[in-house]
């Protein structure tokens, strides 16, 4: 008779799976709570103690860790010496191991969890039995996920070796992820000696950045509730690879603002950001910032969408609209377009709470702290004769907040509540200045605009160009060996200039 070892913390589907195994000629061996569950259902089951001749001990820490279990799992059926050793020690082979692991991740999510409670949820016997079965998957079934029970029963009928190998790989993936979560809990160092992240596939994507590239979306085991991975899609087509990247960028920008704000993004750069007393007012500012580029854009709002705002957005082709909520009548209007993706998001986090970010390179990975720096008035140094007005300081602070989210070389022209022109990704800074000002001057709200730069001005040509296009104040990090030239040029034109001492490159 074949033997199956069952020891599960998640009892989903257990009884029907056990009955299926019995129907296929298996003897069931089980531990603790699993044994009680099966016995209560009237299923014949043998306890592990009866097999090993040794009781469970240490409050259940030692149950299946015994040669009569592990030898039965690990013995190679095609090796006469292995089978003879089993016979000599009166050990029966174990042909299927069904184990799922203690809920460590769920335990550490509890805000009041103690270290002792977390440690008790580190499974030892479960991973050991599963890994043993997976190692010997030429003969032994390793089952870790209740979602696989039906497939396993069918696979047993067909002696499906391919499925057995696939499930073995799944075991090693899940136990590796499980161990990674334990590592991170015990040592949450952001730059550890060994970096062991773990992600689970959320979905296969139609394609990647371009149609000839394959892609999939993976998420952390327990995504931050304010992350895009935790957003809920209410309506529209499936998110694409580019949608996900753009939406994440939009959400990062949105976190910067506490007042009603609307962020519009194209190709991971902002094309319009507006602030207002109401979310409708913020939308009006964001739209007016660049009515052309917003077409086909990703929109993020930090207040619920009301009917008036929805009716305005509905007039445009937009890829995504994200907000904390949608009023019922607003949702009804927006959902008339079957393809627009409507997502609810949580915007509670501030940028300072977001930890690290990673960038893959060929053969490696870069990890850095996110650019959470936000300059305060105390960080600013006025370096020109002319000092900025209070209103200009507000506009400079807003432009400075936006510019760190723009691809370098980055220039932002703005008022205190609205971007007017954005120059992104140019290989020389004057090119970004020209782009930003060309766009900004088309805006009816241009008079009195200010300019922000993500890095210092290597020459005074940027200030010269800004002055000729009526910029009244500039904020930049400073630090160039030619700072003096730019400052003198600003003084010549009567422009107020403020330095921060902080660069905000974005690649």
Curated annotation (Swiss-Prot):
GO terms for molecular function: IMP cyclohydrolase activity; phosphoribosylaminoimidazolecarboxamide formyltransferase activity. InterPro entries: AICAR_Tfase_dup_dom_sf, Cytidine_deaminase-like, MGS-like_dom, MGS-like_dom_sf, PurH-like. GO terms for biological process: 'de novo' IMP biosynthetic process. Signal peptide: none annotated. The keyword Lipoprotein does not apply. SUPFAM superfamilies: Cytidine deaminase-like, Methylglyoxal synthase-like. It comes from the Bacteria. It catalyses: (6R)-10-formyltetrahydrofolate + 5-amino-1-(5-phospho-beta-D-ribosyl)imidazole-4-carboxamide = 5-formamido-1-(5-phospho-D-ribosyl)imidazole-4-carboxamide + (6S)-5,6,7,8-tetrahydrofolate; IMP + H2O = 5-formamido-1-(5-phospho-D-ribosyl)imidazole-4-carboxamide. Pathway: Purine metabolism; IMP biosynthesis via de novo pathway; 5-formamido-1-(5-phospho-D-ribosyl)imidazole-4-carboxamide from 5-amino-1-(5-phospho-D-ribosyl)imidazole-4-carboxamide (10-formyl THF route): step 1/1; Purine metabolism; IMP biosynthesis via de novo pathway; IMP from 5-formamido-1-(5-phospho-D-ribosyl)imidazole-4-carboxamide: step 1/1. HAMAP family: PurH (MF_00139). Belongs to the PurH family. NCBIfam families: PRK00881.1, purH. This is Bifunctional purine biosynthesis protein PurH. It comes from Lacticaseibacillus paracasei (strain ATCC 334 / BCRC 17002 / CCUG 31169 / CIP 107868 / KCTC 3260 / NRRL B-441).
């Amino acid at each position: 008779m074949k033997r199956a070892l069952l020891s599960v913390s998640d009892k989903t589907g257990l009884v029907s799976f056990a009955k299926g195994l019995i129907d296929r000629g298996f003897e069931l061996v089980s531990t603790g709570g699993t044994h009680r569950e099966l016995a209560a259902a009237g299923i014949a089951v043998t306890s592990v103690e009866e097999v090993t001749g040794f009781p469970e001990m240490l409050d259940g820490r030692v149950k299946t860790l015994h040669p009569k279990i592990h030898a039965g799992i690990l013995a190679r059926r095609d090796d006469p010496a292995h089978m003879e050793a089993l016979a000599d020690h009166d050990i029966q082979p174990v042909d299927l191991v069904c184990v799922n692991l203690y809920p460590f991740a769920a335990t550490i999510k509890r805000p009041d969890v103690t270290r002792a409670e977390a440690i008790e949820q580190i499974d030892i016997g479960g991973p050991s039995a599963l890994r043993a079965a997976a190692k010997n998957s030429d003969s032994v079934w390793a089952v870790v996920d209740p979602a696989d029970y039906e497939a396993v029963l069918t696979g047993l009928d067909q002696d499906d070796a391919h499925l057995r190998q696939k499930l073995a790989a799944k075991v090693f993936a899940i136990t590796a992820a499980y161990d990674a979560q334990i590592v991170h809990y015990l040592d949450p160092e952001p730059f550890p000696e060994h970096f062991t992240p773990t992600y689970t596939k959320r979905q296969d994507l139609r394609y990647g950045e371009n149609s000839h590239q394959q892609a999939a979306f993976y998420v952390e085991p327990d995504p931050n509730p304010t992350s895009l991975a935790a957003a809920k899609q209410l309506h529209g087509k499936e998110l694409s690879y580019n949608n996900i990247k753009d939406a994440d960028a939009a959400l990062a920008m949105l976190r910067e603002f506490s007042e009603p704000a609307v962020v519009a993004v194209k190709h991971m750069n902002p094309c319009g950001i507006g602030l207002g007393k109401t979310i409708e007012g913020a939308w009006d500012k964001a739209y007016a910032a660049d009515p052309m580029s917003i077409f086909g854009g990703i929109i993020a709002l930090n207040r619920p969408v009301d009917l008036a705002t929805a009716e305005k957005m509905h007039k445009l082709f937009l890829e995504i609209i994200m907000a904390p909520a949608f009023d019922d009548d607003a949702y009804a209007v927006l959902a008339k377009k079957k393809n627009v993706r409507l997502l609810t998001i949580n915007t509670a986090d501030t940028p300072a709470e977001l930890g690290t970010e990673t960038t893959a390179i060929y053969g490696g990975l870069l990890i850095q702290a996110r650019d959470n720096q936000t300059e305060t008035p105390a960080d600013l140094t006025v370096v020109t004769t002319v000092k900025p007005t209070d209103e200009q300081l507000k506009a400079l602070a807003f432009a400075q907040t936006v510019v760190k989210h723009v691809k370098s070389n980055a220039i932002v022209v703005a008022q205190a509540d609205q971007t007017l022109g954005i120059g992104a990704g140019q290989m020389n800074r004057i090119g970004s200045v020209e782009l930003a000002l060309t766009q900004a001057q088309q805006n009816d709200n241009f008079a009195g605009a200010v300019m922000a730069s993500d890095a210092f001005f290597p020459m005074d040509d940027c200030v010269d160009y800004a002055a000729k296009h009526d910029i009244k104040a500039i904020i930049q990090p400073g630090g160039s060996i030619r700072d003096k030239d730019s400052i003198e040029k600003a003084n010549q034109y009567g422009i107020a200039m403020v330095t921060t001492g902080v660069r905000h490159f974005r690649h």
